[in-house]
């Protein structure tokens, strides 16, 4: 009997064999990301960033974001407040784009299954880029960027041209169901 080949993006392995209480299971690290959207001539686009191949999620295409730092809480003890602050901070660090967390729409929250690998419990927000003229990547953590239609990003992933982690793929899939940016924002504004 042959063993199934593991897909290169399968970082979770056999999730049915583990639980949070197992020895060696690392606790999830709180994190946040912003799915930044803009109108385009045909439809709308999402900002994707390519991670440096030498760091966590190396070579993957992701949305701007990162872990929640203690200072992101400010005087608040609210995790969503801290997640929004982290998303603003990380987006500025990675792209040079300044955002206001009041413009964020809560989209989803992902926590990977238990395991020995580093894992992030991530808040996903969506926001419309208002007047963003340029993206200034840091050339350290981030090596490339692209504004792309969600359906085109999925097609590139399917062709093996870009790598996506499962939450990014699913987010792009949800977005690809909408033709216009106003429809995306309208739907998810009502859903939260």
Q: What are these regions, as identified by a protein language model?
A:
Residues 1-142, 146-192:
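N-terminal leader/linker segments that precede catalytic domains of diphosphate-processing enzymes
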């Amino acid at each position: 009997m042959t063993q199934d080949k593991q897909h290169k993006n399968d970082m979770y392995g056999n999730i049915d064999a583990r639980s949070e209480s197992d020895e060696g299971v690392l606790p999830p690290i709180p994190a946040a990301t912003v799915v930044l959207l803009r109108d385009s001539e045909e439809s709308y686009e999402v900002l994707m960033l390519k991670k440096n191949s030498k760091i966590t999620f190396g070579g993957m295409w992701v949305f701007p974001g990162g872990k929640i730092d203690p200072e992101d809480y400010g005087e608040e003890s609210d995790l969503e407040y801290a997640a929004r602050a982290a998303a603003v901070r990380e987006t500025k660090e990675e792209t040079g784009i300044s955002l206001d967390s009041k413009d964020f729409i809560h989209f989803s929250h992902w926590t990977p299954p238990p395991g020995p690998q580093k894992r992030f419990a991530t808040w996903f927000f969506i926001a419309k880029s208002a007047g963003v003229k340029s993206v200034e990547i840091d050339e350290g953590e981030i090596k490339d960027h692209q504004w792309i239609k969600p359906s085109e990003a999925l097609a590139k992933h399917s062709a093996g041209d870009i790598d996506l982690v499962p939450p990014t793929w699913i987010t792009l899939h949800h977005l690809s169901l909408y033709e216009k940016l106003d429809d995306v924002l309208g739907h998810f504004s009502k859903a939260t």
